[in-house]
Every structure is written in structure tokens, then in C-alpha cells.
Amino acid sequence: MSQRQFKVIIIGGSVTGLTLAHSLHKIGIDYVVLEKRDTVTPQEGASIGILPNGARILDQLGLYEAIEDEAPPLGATRIHFPDGFAFTSLYPKKILENFGYPIAFLERRQLLRILYDALPDKTRIHVNKTMSTIEHFTKDEITGARVLTKEGDVYEGDLIVGADGIHSQTRGEIWRRINSSKSEFEPAECIDKCILIEYSCCFGISKCVTGLIAGEQVMHMRNGRTLVVIPSKDEVVFWFLVEKLDRKYTYSEAPRFTIDDATALCSQVFTLPIGNGIKFEDVWNKREVVNMLSLEESCLSTWSTGRLVCIGDSIHKVSIPS
């Protein structure tokens, strides 16, 4: 009798989830990816920075060349302080010299598209699949785990990996099982003690912004507030404005923001200079998409139980100020 092939069920078509899919493919392990949205490349207005540690992994997976084509490397950073002092730092070039890879930014959606397009077998990626229940089972003396979806589908495998982000359902299932178990595991953490919010971030993508040089980042450091503007190729500009909140919030009381909140916050930095006579208001006026979110921070001690494990933001998330 042939041995059954080990199979991994990945919850979440995130950057983490799709990168894991590539890793499993490289070593010949069967897998499926379940994504609750109708696409693995949603437009959320977010950019993503690729640092040398991540670039090295993506290069090993054969993905980095496609990223290089989309993301010009940072070469210099112009940093402004509240007292008017400003200087140009070449730390991005030093990072390239020291580690062999640069810092580079691209649209998060572009990175997801690169990860998805490079997968050899796209039939393993299932969208519109929302996890409902996770079960352990024994069948014909073989044990495993299955995922039931709200859409009525059933997926069976040997390991379930939660790559479903800070609002992870997989993490919730792990904690539920640990709390109901009589094993010697430590009690699962209270989510409000482990996931805290001290900052908000308004972020966006602007297009057709002329006069800025790709790869020359601009930062304005203010008391409790930081604006970062990153010109990219084809007159695209990534930017984000981080603000310290009035207090530290728990996960359950995380502030929610509207487009009016984003506009009100960004209008306070309209006059800040970006370069070549351009002010942030000019970048704002060319915006294509804008979003504003609370920035969660966490580092959880319970990552797994049984055949369930969480990775990425679901168990370890740092905010931009960190």
C-alpha cells in the first residue's frame, strides 16, 4: 500500500500564506490555500517594504527578480525634524553594501500578484472560502485535520496553518482548544492582554506625481507623528502618516477610522515639503486610494496545538514605529 502524501491546508492567501505555498512546492509537499475574499490581490491602498532578510528568502524561491522589476531600491532618505533641522542619510545604500539586498517598496497588491502568478499550480488556490470549523479526525487508522467552510466545502489534510493575519480565526480555534483541554499546555492568552494598539496609520498611493526621484525617501519626524513619502517608478508615490493615539487601546476597543478621519489627519501636514517645490498636499491631491487603520502590536507565546499552527501577523505583528 502506498503511503499517503502529507498535505498542508493554508488558511489565508496573504503574503505569508502564498510564500509558504511556494516553499512547500519547492520541497514537494502537497497543499491548498483557502482565501475568504474573492481575490488574492485586493487593492487596499497599501505598500509593502522588502528588506534584506525577506529579499533573501524570496530570492531562494526564485521570486526576487520579478520584484526587482517593480520596486526601485531606496538610495537616500531625507529626514526632517520639528526644529527645522534636516539631513540626508545614505543608510539604504549601506544596507545594500552590508547585506547584498536593498530596501525596496512596491504595492502590496503587486507583491501578491507576483507570488500568485509564479505558482505552478493555481488550482490549489481557492477563493471565496471562509473557514467555519476545524476538526481532527481518524479515518482508516489515519489521523488528520479537516477544515469546513461556510460555503459548504470540506478540505482534509495533515496540518492546518493559519496565515490569516491579525484577526486570525485559526488563532481563535487554537486558543479555544487549549482552554478546553486538560493537557499541560499553558492557558491561552487573553487577546486583550496580548494585542495592543498605540498608533494609527493613514496610508495611500498617489499617481502622476511629477518632480520626485524614484528611490529617494522623505521623512518628517514630528512630536507623536511621522510622515513617510516614498517615490517609486512611473511617477507613483507610496506614503503613510503614523500618529500616536491618545492612549493605548486593547484589541477589542481598537479605534476605527473613516475617510473623513484620514482627510482631517492628512490636512494637518499638507504644508510639509517633499522636494523640488512639492508639498504633501500635492501628493494628497493625486491620491488613487487611501486607507486608515489602527496598528496592532503583538508577540504571542502560544503558536500551535495539535495539528494547528499560526504564522505571520496572526501571532507576531510589529507596527511601523517599532
From Swiss-Prot:
Protein name: FAD-dependent monooxygenase subE
GO BP, one annotated term: terpenoid biosynthetic process
Family: Belongs to the paxM FAD-dependent monooxygenase family.
Record-listed E.C. numbers: 1.-.-.-
Pathway in which this enzyme or protein is active: Secondary metabolite biosynthesis; terpenoid biosynthesis
GN (gene name): subE
Task of the protein: FAD-dependent monooxygenase; part of the gene cluster that mediates the biosynthesis of the immunosuppressants subglutinols, meroterpenoids consisting of an alpha-pyrone (4-hydroxy-5,6-dimethyl-2-pyrone) moiety attached to a decalin core fused to a five-membered cyclic ether carrying a prenylside chain. The first step of the pathway is the synthesis of the alpha-pyrone moiety by the polyketide synthase subA via condensation of one acetyl-CoA starter unit with 3 malonyl-CoA units and 2 methylations.
Signals that turn on the gene: The subglutinol cluster is highly expressed when mycelia and hyphae are transferred to fresh media for a 3 hour induction period, remaining expressed under conditions of heat shock. The cluster is repressed in cultures reaching stationary phase or in early germinating cultures, as well as under conditions of UV, salt and oxidative stress.
Pfam families: FAD_binding_3
Database matches in InterPro entries: FAD-bd, FAD/NAD-bd_sf, FAD_mOase_fung
Keyword vocabulary terms for this entry: FAD, Flavoprotein, Monooxygenase, Oxidoreductase
Organism: Metarhizium robertsii (strain ARSEF 23 / ATCC MYA-3075) (Metarhizium anisopliae (strain ARSEF 23))
Annotated positions binding FAD: 35, 49, 108, 313
Required cofactor(s): FAD
Keyword Lipid metabolism: no
Broad EC category: oxidoreductase
Listed GO MF terms: FAD binding; monooxygenase activity
